[in-house]
Amino acid sequence: XXKLVESGXXLVQPGGSLRLSKXYTENVNHPATTTXYKXQPMTPDFTEXQTHEGTHQDVFDQPNLXXWKGNTLPEGYEPAKXGEXGTQDANPKXXQDGDEXTXTGXXQXDKIGRYNLXPTIFFEATPPKANENQ
């Protein structure tokens, strides 16, 4: 039929959010075209109204908990102090083994349980085959 979802919109399923990946492109005339989706788990802190603010992939790629609208930092975390080398915007008050140097950016296996960035699950939807008469 038509597009599965409009660009930028999110499909929310129980226990998670389903969203178009950044690299989403489509050629509706090509029968082999597949559309990739990224899914991220919902955290208990998000309400229905906060879903679209908090679960976009680029937010997970660049963790910036302080900038999430309508959210407060989870218990045990505080904003990074200016001048600290290699810190994120939310740092554990007590350091854990292997947490000393955490680089911001790409999917890292962090120890923030509710904000675990990995793994990323890809959902693929295959569009209907093109009409042979076209």
Swiss-Prot record:
Belongs to the zinc-containing alcohol dehydrogenase family. Residues 31-115 are annotated as: Disordered. It catalyses: xylitol + NAD(+) = D-xylulose + NADH + H(+). GO terms for biological process: D-xylose metabolic process. It is an enzyme of class 1 (oxidoreductase). Residues 50-59 have a biased composition (Basic and acidic residues). The lineage of its organism: Eukaryota, Metazoa, Chordata, Craniata, Vertebrata. This is D-xylulose reductase. Activated by calcium and inhibited by zinc. The keyword Magnesium does not apply. Its EC number is 1.1.1.9. It comes from Sus scrofa (Pig). One of its GO terms (molecular function) is D-xylulose reductase activity. Keywords: Carbohydrate metabolism, Metal-binding, NAD, Oxidoreductase, Xylose metabolism, Zinc. It comes from the Eukaryota.
